[in-house]
Amino acid sequence: LEAFLPHAAEAGKPHCPTLIFARRFTRRAMTQTRMPARRLPATGVVAAIVALIVTFVSSTIAIAQDLPVKSGEKIAFLGDSITAAGSNSPSGYVWLVIHGLEANGVKTTPIHAGVSGNTSKDMLGRLERDVIDKKPDWMTLSCGVNDVWHGAGGVALDPYKKNITEIVDKCQAAGIKVMILTSTMIGEDQANDNNKKLVEYNDFLRGLAKEKKCLLAELNGDMQAALKQPEGAPPRKGNLLTVDGVHMNPLGNQMMATGILKGFGLSEAQMEKAHDAWLDMPNAVEVTGKVNVTLRQYDRLSKLAESQHRSVSDLVNEEVGKAVETLEKSAPAD
């Protein structure tokens, strides 16, 4: 089988996904064949299996080719601190988009263009340097939170419309395809004044995407839907998707990445592949815990760490990791 599988030949790994499928399929084909395997011509069995495998691999590649974004392309992520954080963490939305595409056979390169505190005016001012000069194939545009949130220091609706339109026009003139993201919420309460003001900004973005034939990721609607509680449910304590009402936590980053991938046209089955890839990413989320110990305990930890040529923090983090695995095993099934 390996001779017929270029992916396996290239990887040379027994756990290559295509090879795993081939082996499982072979076993299934041999056990489900009505005629005993010994009475089938060996070459006929192999030929049939190979034909089905080739069909499977070809269909997988075809699905990836049907997406508007292709392998080898570059995606610029233009935005503010939400985007900057989305680039700086392995579980940030920028990297989740990249890994989600890769899980579906589309390998792309990110161009990180998020700057903390930026408004539409700021993004327009650095567009040439941070995006156009780097010649991406795609750009996602996340802008609106600071234009509203910063009040008098932000950008009113009319100049915002002008700035965003100019950003899109310049990118399209440079041959860059654009996906517009509706602005995420400012506080996890749609009834607050900032979110009410943001409605007009997002309405404009939806209209502009349609007018300029840009892809659209409906992140604001997705965020509102995720935060909606059943009727009669008690008020939620703390934030669900953000660390502070604005900047995303791991769940919020997954929400954003999901919206962007759907904007790129990924199917439900492809989204499942993306989510599965995210869930098993190593060191994706840093969980910080406060551990109080006595001086005697600290002295012992220090000696143990020194004997292993490690730091106390590394030692404690390893034990916390083991505790998380234990808790996970005892948690109720999904």
Give the predicted meaning of each segment:
Residues 1-78, 83-90, 98-107, 133-137, ...:
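N-terminal secretory targeting modules
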Residues 66-71, 91, 95-109, 118, ...:
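Alpha-helical cap/lid subdomain in secreted, periplasmic
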